[in-house]
């Protein structure tokens, strides 16, 4: 079993060309190569909550991620899953190397127990477990929303 995990989180509207190149073009290029090398693999793409599969919404990043998901699902993999986590809270004291993210995590830390009750909030540990489980065992839907990821990623 081979699982490829790529997380691209670019949401700045002013970087729409870069966003499209990195989120769509680079991802599709890598995925097409992998599909040729091993069509029997399971491919998991982490996009994010709010991704627009219709490709017609108002938000550029959501349309690009939706287009990327749609094209990935058409590739000849054994299985492909599009993970759409919302807020990901780092688990086990993991620190972000991005200072602005770490500042946000530090400010939000007192609220984490409350935030974890919402379906769109997931820990990095739950997300990792969900990736391994879906990669190994599959899942009934190709689009996996944050609330489902949370259930799959439970101990």
Residue ranges and their predicted role:
Residues 38-41, 77-78:
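A short helix->loop->beta-strand "cap" motif at the edges of active sites that frequently abuts
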Residues 43-49, 83-85:
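SDR active-site strand-loop-helix element
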Residues 1-35, 52, 135:
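NAD(P)H-binding glycine-rich loop region in Rossmannoid oxidoreductase-like domains
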Residues 6-7, 48-49, 88:
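Beta-hairpin (beta-strand-turn-beta-strand) motif
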Residues 28-32, 41-44, 62, 66, ...:
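Internal, well-ordered alpha-helical scaffold/interface segments
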Residues 35-36, 73:
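Non-catalytic positions within long, well-ordered alpha-helices that form the structural scaffold/packing
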Residues 53-153:
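Oxidoreductase cofactor-interface core, primarily capturing Rossmann-like NAD(P)-dependent enzymes
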Residues 42-45, 98-100:
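Short, flexible segments with low predicted structural confidence
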